[in-house]
């Protein structure tokens, strides 16, 4: 058994529902999206950060099982300069933002307590604000 399955079995015995955040490898999110759909069916909430690519096989799973898709979009900063909605990942060794992210991102929510699916757009600065990100 893999560790996640063991943890889920223990949680199921306790009757606790999980709230899970997943940032899978952008190169192959399919198995992670499939697992998120399974976890939703088991009663758990899964929130994922994914590449904004709606032309993929894994996006069809999102259409069938997710409840919310939030496209992360650009914005004008306080000086009026345009900022893309692309998320810069922090290098764990240097602590500095990695360069070269050429794709946008989206947040996908799998929630067993909500029916249907909605798509929204939210500027990256608002997401940072809501998340407590400090400049």
Spans of model-derived segments:
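Class I S-adenosyl-L-methionine-dependent methyltransferase catalytic core
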Residues: 1-135
């Amino acid at each position: 058994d893999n560790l996640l399955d063991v943890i889920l079995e223990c949680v199921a015995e306790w009757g606790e529902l999980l709230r899970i955040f997943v940032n899978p490898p952008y190169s192959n999110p399919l198995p992670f999206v499939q697992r998120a759909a399974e976890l939703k069916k088991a009663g758990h909430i899964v929130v994922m950060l994914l590449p904004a690519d709606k032309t993929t096989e894994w996006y069809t799973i999102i259409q069938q099982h997710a409840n919310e898709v939030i496209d992360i979009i650009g914005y004008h900063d306080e000086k009026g300069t345009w900022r893309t909605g692309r998320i810069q990942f922090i290098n764990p060794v240097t602590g500095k933002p990695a360069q070269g992210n050429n794709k946008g991102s989206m947040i996908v929510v799998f929630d067993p307590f909500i029916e249907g699916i909605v798509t929204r757009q939210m500027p990256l600065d608002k997401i940072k604000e809501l998340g407590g990100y400090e400049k």
